[in-house]
A protein has these predicted regions:
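Sec-dependent signal peptide cleavage junction
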Residues: 20-39
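Hydrophobic membrane-insertion alpha-helices, especially the h-region
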Residues: 11-22
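Histidine-/acidic-rich catalytic cores in large beta-rich domains
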Residues: 44-122, 143-146, 150-560
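Solvent-exposed serine/threonine-rich low-complexity stretches and specific carbohydrate-binding patches
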Residues: 128-140
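N-terminal Sec-pathway targeting helices
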Residues: 1-13
Length: 560
């Protein structure tokens, strides 16, 4: 009996331990969900600041934010607040990040008795002052005012001064304070800033820092010229690729199967989903004149059946959201696919055929595109994209296409003595007034990597680097003048940059050049002569910034 009693007590104890462990697990899991939710939802920490009640929306993750049904319900809550009471300049409605798409953002709503334009200044201890004039779609001077404030510093008190100026120049001000949530992805509010030798003024705007892998969570940061993070846009599990502003909408990717448009107030007004298709986004997209999204993609069915990736162009209808294939590169470059049979060994596409690796797309017209193919170190122009795609030309060293079908016939003639681009990224089209004549600028990675053809000779690419970031090599900003009328291209500008074998971007902005040497986690701005004005560096241990572009956000957040 004593033995049976001992066994019973042991069994009972085991059950209690098991139940206790289960309860602890459930509590920890619930706590984790709560913590996740709390990092997304704002706190009304400031004078006259209101926070919406989200308890009925079941928001637990970033993916919940980017559901249009959720956003519609949030908009209804805001509308109810606005209609229940009249808000004046003295007693305005101020909401903390109501749409949850900018960690440090504020929503303002009020009316003025006179038509006024609204400007604001943000001050926070130890940081530079941020000032802007707000864009009002009702006109420069208006009586009805609804805005999103960009520029607050996360996790510390900000003093915000709003100024209303009427058409006679008379001003009225209102000042209040607010402490936003801390940043979701970073512990620091400022990047490391290093001054260069150039005395040229930095270009206007905010740097959109896209795909910083040193962060705890995926976000896109808007960074000012002093390196301070002025906005944090959360994304789900992917880079936003780029920001495209058109028709009072801001397009960005939030996952590899979802793009959205935001309005100037931060509301998600449309979501484009690829979840029910066999496509995944990668690298880049453009928006045509009809509001359709033309994107680079991977076909997941072909990835499974043929082990190939990153060689599709798709169209997402801007109205219906319907997804259709525009181009499979294998159909256009069949002879290349017969030759390039090697398997990717270096990137997240290990084990797959990455024959093209298209990494940027530019629309010259709605049915004409310029594609950057990293794997072939080639820039391709394709016409009749939406009907019967046709290769117009290639820009590359002739050695890449020697003995591969008849594609050498597509090569433009190189004018001058320089080494053609290798492993390039961020190819950007800049038109001129002459038909068939334009510029192409790019980040020339100068990386000698081609897993699909391991026997390829890089003899025509002296001093090219390998797959590891190293001070022994250099990348470059390249700017070509392309003349389709003469079938030629020439290098008209070059700036030496820190070496980055993968990723990276460039952009001409206000006659300066913005560059991102992605695998050094450094972006910078250079003057027209190629002298460094200033560089910015993230402080995380992982050195990887996908792309950096600079935007003014005029006629969106800010007035011209």
């Amino acid at each position: 009996l004593q033995l049976k009693r001992k066994l019973f007590l042991l069994a009972l104890g085991s059950i209690v331990v098991t139940l206790t462990a289960s309860l602890i697990f459930v509590k920890q899991k619930a706590s984790s969900n709560a913590t996740s939710s709390e990092t997304i939802l704002p706190v009304a920490n400031g004078q006259t600041i209101t926070t919406l009640d989200y308890s009925d929306l079941n928001i637990k993750s970033v993916s919940d934010i980017y559901q249009t049904a959720t956003q519609t319900k949030i908009a209804q809550k805001i509308k109810q607040l606005e209609t229940n009471k009249t808000y004046s300049f003295d007693k305005m409605l101020v909401l903390a990040n109501p749409y949850l798409t900018n960690t440090t953002g504020l929503y303002l709503h009020f009316s003025t008795t006179k038509a006024t334009k609204i400007s604001y200044t943000v001050k926070s201890k130890g940081t530079s002052t941020f000032s802007q004039t707000l864009y009002n779609p009702n006109g420069t001077y208006a009586k009805d005012h609804t805005y999103q404030l960009i520029g607050l510093i996360a996790g510390q008190e900000n003093t915000i001064t709003i100024t209303a100026t009427d058409q006679t120049g008379q001003k009225e001000t209102k000042t209040f304070t607010y402490t936003p949530n801390k940043l979701r992805g970073s512990k620091q509010n400022q990047l490391k800033v290093t001054k260069g030798t150039s005395k040229t003024k930095l270009s206007s705007g905010l740097y959109a820092v896209i795909g910083d892998k040193s962060l705890k969570t995926r976000n896109t940061y808007l960074v000012d010229n002093d390196g301070y993070i002025r906005a944090e846009i959360p994304t789900i599990n992917y880079n936003s690729l780029r920001l495209v502003q058109t028709d009072n909408k801001l397009y960005l990717a939030v996952d590899d199967d979802q793009l959205v448009t935001l309005d100037r107030l931060g509301q998600v007004v449309q979501s484009y989903s690829l979840k029910d298709t066999n496509f995944k986004l990668h690298h880049d997209f453009a928006v045509d004149s009809q509001g359709n999204i033309i994107a680079l993609a991977t076909d997941t069915k072909l990835k499974a059946s043929e082990k190939r990736v990153e060689d599709q162009i798709i169209k997402i209808d801007g109205t219906s959201g319907q997804v259709s294939r525009l181009l499979d590169f294998k159909d256009l470059l069949g002879d290349l696919y017969k030759t390039a049979t090697g398997i990717e060994t270096l990137t997240n596409n290990k084990g797959y055929r990455d024959v093209i690796h298209a990494n940027s797309i530019q629309l010259t017209k709605d049915d004409q595109v310029i594609i950057s193919s990293r794997e072939t170190s080639t820039i391709m122009k394709i016409s009749s994209l939406t009907s019967h795609p046709k290769l117009d030309y290639f820009i590359s060293d002739p050695s890449v296409w020697q003995g591969v079908g008849t594609y050498s016939n597509l090569l433009l003639n190189k004018v001058g003595n320089f080494t053609s681009q290798a492993g390039q990224h961020s190819v950007t089209y800049i038109p001129t007034e002459t038909a068939g004549v334009y510029y192409l600028e790019m980040f020339n990675n100068n990386s000698a990597i081609m897993n699909s053809r391991t026997n390829f000779s890089w003899a025509n690419y002296p001093n090219s680097g390998g797959a590891t970031a190293s001070n022994d090599y250099q990348s470059s900003y390249y700017k070509y003048l392309v003349n389709e009328n003469t079938g030629s291209y020439q290098l008209v500008k070059k700036i030496s940059l820190p070496y980055s074998p993968f990723i990276s971007s460039v952009q001409t902005k206000d006659n300066n050049v913005v560059t991102d040497s992605g695998m050094t986690a450094t972006f910078a701005e250079y003057d027209a002569d190629g002298k460094l004005i200033q560089s910015f560096e993230t402080t995380g241990s992982t050195k990887f910034i996908y792309r950096v572009y600079k935007y003014d956000f005029n006629n969106f957040y800010f007035a011209n």
